[in-house]
Amino acid sequence: MAITEVFTHKQPLGNSDPAHTAYGPGELTASTPAMTPLMLDATSGKLTVWDGAHAGAATGILAVTADQNSAELAFYKSGSFRIEDVLWPSAVTDENIKRNAFAGTAISIV
């Protein structure tokens, strides 16, 4: 009996910048896949899904899938990521907003 595994290469890093993760309190409202941009909620101060309203407001990228029951979120706080690998909000279609979403942080979009 042979066990067959399927390997799918997933390399979201787009450059040689070191990628570091951190943990922070979150308040997701639904199941959220890894590689989703995050921002700080202005009222609670917790991490939530970036709304895409303003470039420079995103603070991190969700590192592992999480949901509304996840009190603490693992997220990338630094690194370079390919623009096509980040799960952008559907309302954000302007590439300039995507590339500058993390302005002022240690995250680069390439």
From Swiss-Prot:
Region annotation (Disordered) ranges: 1-27
Highest rank taxon of the organism: Viruses
GO cellular component terms, semicolon-separated: viral capsid, decoration
Keyword Transport: no
Gene3D superfamilies: Head decoration protein D
Keyword Cytoplasm: no
Keyword list, A-Z: Capsid decoration protein, Capsid protein, Late protein, Virion
Protein's cellular compartments: Virion
Main location class: virion
Function: Putative decoration protein.
Protein name, as recorded: Putative decoration protein
Organism: Escherichia phage N15 (Bacteriophage N15)
